[in-house]
């Protein structure tokens, strides 16, 4: 049975049925897949719709052009075309199967005439559900609906194979923890820990983009915990792990890391604010001192700004983003930051702020 939330998506976006109809009239199969199905079921709005089809990219381009749609050929080499309708973006990809070399996450693509094989190549079961719009039927060969209802992140094939093939999927799993509040099952999480070295073949730009999506999610602290506890942070942002330091030797409190997670959750969900929150105490491990049994972190904001700059340059952030984030990190203890909407960074924790 198709959830009413997904039916609502079709009712609100009647052009989707039109697209399915002109593909069907031309003798082609067409299925809605990926995030549109997942988020439609969860009643999360979207303006991006992904389809899979047995039509070639050229055939899809012709169909959309003949029906008055604007199109782009970005991704055509991978069997994907884009069509535009008002403020909506439609991506249509020919059924395919992917294979990978050990040294690259870029797949070698071969066409397929089999929907199930196309779904099998996808990152997680929650994204491997197809919807036949005209038949009003869900195709779910990998139990994605069950995982979606239980909030579980797992893979259509062996997680070990999936993450070795495309290591960025490991960070994407952490992103879904943040954006949707889901959790990897034990096998999936163990596979991430086992394959963290594979993340080194992924470009810093792709890592940055996925990290951004994690940070602007509704549950960023949960995503960061998964990022750290899986070991991925050691390969991408090892400075983060160093925040687990004692600030009260007598009671062995380790609250710099926990304080950081609280702050990240409290600030506005834009990437500059969230990154500044994540990095605002990054200088504390390098400035920790003890006088008369009391811990201090003198000038940690200045040191933190320098460390932040190194991290952000490594991850290929823009000069403007680096400047804005480092300015917030360096000034997060000053009163005028309240005027910048930055009071959350002055959250009072048991640790000294000096």
Where are these regions (language model features)?
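Catalytic cores of the polymerase beta-like nucleotidyltransferase superfamily
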Residues: 1-353
């Amino acid at each position: 049975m198709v959830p009413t939330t997904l039916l609502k998506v079709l009712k609100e976006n009647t052009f989707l049925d039109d697209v399915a109809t002109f593909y069907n009239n031309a003798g082609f199969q067409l299925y809605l897949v990926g995030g549109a199905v997942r988020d439609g079921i969860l009643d999360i709005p979207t303006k991006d719709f992904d389809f899979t089809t047995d039509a070639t990219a050229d055939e899809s381009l012709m169909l959309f052009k003949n029906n008055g749609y604007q199109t782009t050929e970005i991704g055509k080499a991978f069997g994907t075309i884009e069509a535009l309708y008002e403020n909506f973006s439609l991506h249509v990809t020919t059924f395919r199967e992917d294979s990978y070399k050990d040294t690259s996450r870029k797949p070698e693509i071969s066409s397929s005439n089999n929907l199930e094989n196309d779904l099998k190549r996808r990152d997680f079961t929650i994204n491997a559900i197809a919807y036949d719009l005209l038949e009003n039927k869900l195709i779910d060969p990998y139990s994605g609906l069950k995982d979606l209802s239980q909030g579980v992140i797992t893979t259509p094939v062996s997680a070990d194979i999936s993450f070795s093939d495309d290591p960025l999927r490991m960070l994407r799993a952490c992103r879904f923890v943040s954006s949707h509040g889901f959790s990897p099952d034990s096998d999936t999480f163990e596979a991430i820990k086992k394959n963290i070295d594979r993340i080194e073949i992924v470009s810093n730009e792709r890592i940055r983009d996925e990290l951004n999506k994690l940070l602007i999610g509704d549950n960023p602290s949960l995503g960061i915990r998964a990022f750290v506890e899986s070991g991925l942070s050691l390969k991408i942002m090892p400075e983060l792990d160093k925040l687990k330091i004692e600030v009260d030797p007598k009671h062995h409190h380790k609250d710099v890391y926990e304080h950081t997670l609280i702050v990240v959750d409290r600030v506005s969900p834009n990437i500059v604010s969230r990154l500044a929150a994540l990095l605002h105490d990054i200088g504390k491990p390098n400035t920790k001192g003890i006088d008369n049994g009391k811990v201090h972190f003198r000038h940690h904001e200045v040191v933190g700004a320098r460390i932040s700059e190194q991290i952000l340059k490594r991850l290929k952030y823009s000069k403007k983003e680096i400047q804005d984030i480092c300015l917030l990190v360096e000034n997060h203890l000053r009163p005028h930051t309240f005027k910048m909407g930055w009071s959350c960074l002055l959250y009072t924790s048991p640790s000294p702020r000096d």
